[in-house]
Regions:
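Helix-rich C-terminal "cap"/substrate-channel and partner-interaction subdomain
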Residues: 297-388, 459, 463
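Conserved N-terminal/central alpha/beta ligand/cofactor-binding core
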Residues: 33, 39-151, 268-277, 282-283, ...
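A glycine-rich dinucleotide-binding beta-alpha-beta segment and adjacent secondary-structure elements
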Residues: 160, 343-434, 438
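Glycine-rich loop(s) and the adjacent beta-strand/alpha-helix scaffold that form part
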Residues: 178, 182-251, 446, 455
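Core beta-strand elements of the Rossmann-like FAD/NAD(P) dinucleotide-binding domain
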Residues: 6-9, 176-186, 420
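A conserved short coil-to-beta-strand element within the FAD-binding core of flavoproteins
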Residues: 154-167
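Beta1/beta-strand and adjacent pyrophosphate-binding region of the FAD-binding site
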Residues: 5-19, 35
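An anion/pyrophosphate-binding glycine-rich loop and adjacent beta-alpha core
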Residues: 221, 225-343
Length: 466
């Protein structure tokens, strides 16, 4: 039996992370009644936003924590390159432009920024870092939402949406063990992708998905996404595409967060279970390439890789939470990793012979490359010959998936007939595939969530007023 809520709301926000909060705050600022539903318990609220560190920002001149400039066209070209053109230029440029002035709004709701830390992907020019990280940002937003009168319910799972001819009327939720119906004039879907749904990942990837680790929340099961698609929303994106990085293989199955990411890939070599290299570790700056390495490792035998460096590279990257495997020789390192010692020694020797002299500088695209080696290492190639040697085991770490719902510039969900749903809006991961067809840029997930959260909140509030 489904119990009907006695109250109807102007704006119903599904989700509890950055995009959901931006929508709820914006709608409430306009004066609409807002109910936000978070499936997670209060101590785990916030989705993947708990693990974020920064926001990628367009700016034409130095501004507080941002150095130099990062103009719109450069931002756009960076995005175009990593996505291979699989992006909506209209929505992407809208996102980029919105980042130029969103920080003032964020600060009004309690966000605090700090200069980039050493070793954080060389992004002090392009990214503004949150003081205290994502959890501090979320706590500030929740405080602001509560002060403004946003109603928030935790442990509340959305299991269905009533949508008739593209128009939303109510949501069915499970709360305190009971099915309840909640009515609202508008709805904002900001409940994340399906990255926590192991069965759905396996449906897309096959058996290899068994070896994937989920970097963030276990609550992003894709329930709202699935319901929207089943109710006629037009999908966008490939279910096999997403923000996927190489993380320490010793990380937990869920919620390891950013501290499990391995950032020394571009400083050394990466080998697979056969002790063979399989990709150019120095192709481009790490912020533009770190998010392809999860997918690369996923394509290797047993979905495992090993990032190998020598002592020369220590101290040049932000160390992950787990200590590296350490050895005084390459064969000894191979044994510790369970690799064939002769094979690893041959791979390292071959790499060392191919390294050409240059001026090593990890802050620029330097001239330290290899010659006659397949795959090559284009930049930052230095011989691995100074003990002790170190290694980090790698697994694919899924951050979020790109399969989502299609939206327009008003954040309205587009239905299969090509028409926008008049009162259904989407923000964050659930629609990020409109901007990210593949690839990733550090901090752009927060740019998308913040931009479309605010747009969705404003548009939902204005629709509810009529």
């Amino acid at each position: 039996m489904t119990m009907e809520s006695a109250r109807s709301y102007d704006v119903l926000v599904l989700g509890g992370g950055n995009a959901a909060l931006c929508a709820a705050l914006t709608a409430r600022e306009i004066g609409r009644s807002v109910l936000m539903l978070e499936w997670a318990p209060k101590h785990s609220r916030g989705g993947n936003s708990r693990h974020v560190r920064n926001l990628r920002c367009m700016h034409d001149a130095p501004a507080d924590v941002l150095t130099d400039s990062y103009p719109e066209e450069e931002y756009w070209q960076d995005l175009l390159k990593v996505t291979g053109g699989q992006t909506s230029e209209e929505l992407a440029r809208m996102t980029i432009r919105a980042t130029a002035d969103c920080r003032g709004w964020m600060i009004r709701h309690g966000a605090r920024f700090q200069p980039a830390l050493g070793g954080t992907l060389h992004v002090s020019r392009t990214n503004a870092f949150f003081l205290g990280g994502g959890k501090a940002l979320l706590n500030a937003y929740y405080r602001s939402a509560e002060a403004l009168g946003v109603e928030i319910r935790y442990d509340c799972e959305v299991v269905d949406l009533a949508i008739d001819d593209g128009r939303f009327t109510s949501a069915t939720v499970i709360e305190e063990g009971e099915r309840r119906e909640i009515r609202a004039k508008t709805v904002v879907a900001a409940a994340g992708g399906f990255e926590s749904n192991l069965a759905w990942l396996k449906e897309a990837w096959g058996p290899v998905a068994d070896n994937f680790l989920i970097r963030g929340t276990p609550y992003n099961m894709g329930r709202v996404l699935r319901v929207l698609i089943d109710r006629g929303a037009k999908s966008i994106g490939d279910p096999k595409q997403g923000h996927s990085v190489a993380i320490d293989a010793r990380a937990p199955k869920f919620d390891g967060g950013i501290c499990t990411r391995v950032d020394c890939v571009s400083l050394g070599i990466v080998v697979n279970a056969d002790a063979q290299r399989f990709y150019d570790e120095g192709e481009d700056f790490w912020p533009k390439r770190y998010a392809i390495w999860g997918r690369l490792v996923a394509g290797q035998p047993d979905q495992i890789g090993y990032s190998i460096i020598d002592v020369k590279s220590m101290g040049r990257f932000m160390p992950p939470v787990f200590p590296p495997v350490k050895a005084n020789s390459i064969p000894e390192l191979a044994k510790a990793l369970g690799l064939d010692p002769a094979a690893l020694e041959a791979t390292v020797s071959s790499f060392n012979r191919a390294v050409r002299p240059g001026n090593f500088d990890h802050t620029v695209l330097d001239d330290c490359g290899t010659e006659g080696l397949a795959p090559p290492k284009t930049h930052w190639a230095r011989t691995i010959d100074t003990p002790p040697y170190f290694a980090y085991p790698l697994r694919p770490g899924i951050t979020f998936t790109y399969l989502g719902v299609t939206v327009n510039a008003k954040a309205q969900v587009i239905m299969n007939d090509g028409k926008p749903a008049p009162n259904i809006f989407a923000a964050g991961e659930i629609m990020a595939g409109n901007v990210l067809g593949k690839g990733y840029l550090a901090g752009i997930g927060m740019s998308i969530g913040t931009t479309f959260g605010r747009i969705a909140g404003e548009q939902a509030a204005r629709h509810a007023a009529h």
